[in-house]
Amino acid sequence: MSSLLLFNDKSRALQADIVAVQSQVVYGSVGNSIAVPAIKQNGLNVFAVPTVLLSNTPHYDTFYGGAIPDEWFSGYLRALQERDALRQLRAVTTGYMGTASQIKILAEWLTALRKDHSDLLIMVDPVIGDIDSGIYVKPDLPEAYRQYLLPLAQGITPNIFELEILTGKNCRDLDSAIAAAKSLLSDTLKWVVITSASGNEENQEMQVVVVSADSVNVISHSRVKTDLKGTGDLFCAQLISGLLKGEALTDAVHRAGLRVLEVMRYTQQHESDELILPPLAEA
């Protein structure tokens, strides 16, 4: 078969259920390096678009790499359309973004994409920082999230610190966190999943809060003491997979949390510093 046929017949193009836009590492299990295999375990097709490419996370004594240049990043997105690979696209997820300009480029691409995919689910994990570390992204990223990505998202998955940054409100107790989340809801943004709400430290519990216009659901999970990285990326991968498989939002959040706990325990049993995905049948 000639290469002309192989590479010019768009009817033969691979198709994606999900485009996942976030960080990638050569060594380790964060960003798309954990999200892609997790999504594939759920029987879904995913294309990974990197925002940064690093040798490993900065928690090691050496690391190399950095943000993907804007020209490359916009080209990665454009190429998916040029290859006609998005006919069956159902969702786009975002995680760690390297620069504010990437967020603007992504928002423009999503806006154009929506013209042909009116039912597209856009889920944004607004990676900004956490209570322990503060802001660990470039200082212009929070405003870029507010200006460009939040108006396009159907759902977002901030932690408490990120919710505070996005809303400018104190969220250190459950009621204030719920109120802050509700302040973000709009005709487009239908739900907020707060991934680190106030839990019961004495009972070793953590809480995930699912907030929509007409309901609030608090989901409690066991707390696993660990410094493992990438658990939030894994959670979002499991969440979007559950939603695309037809699970209700609260059920998908609950199942995603349970899967993350299973993976963390499995990783600890294997004495690894990086997340290891067990087969779903063993989880």
Swiss-Prot record:
InterPro entries: PdxK, PM/HMP-P_kinase-1, PyrdxlKinase, Ribokinase-like. Its cofactor is Mg(2+). Pathway: Cofactor metabolism; pyridoxal 5'-phosphate salvage; pyridoxal 5'-phosphate from pyridoxal: step 1/1; Cofactor metabolism; pyridoxal 5'-phosphate salvage; pyridoxine 5'-phosphate from pyridoxine: step 1/1; Cofactor metabolism; pyridoxal 5'-phosphate salvage; pyridoxamine 5'-phosphate from pyridoxamine: step 1/1. Substrate binds at S23, H59, D233. GO terms for biological process: pyridoxal 5'-phosphate salvage. Its EC number is 2.7.1.35. It comes from the Bacteria. The keyword Nucleotide-binding applies. It is an enzyme of class 2 (transferase). Belongs to the pyridoxine kinase family. PdxK subfamily. This is Pyridoxine/pyridoxal/pyridoxamine kinase. The gene is pdxK.
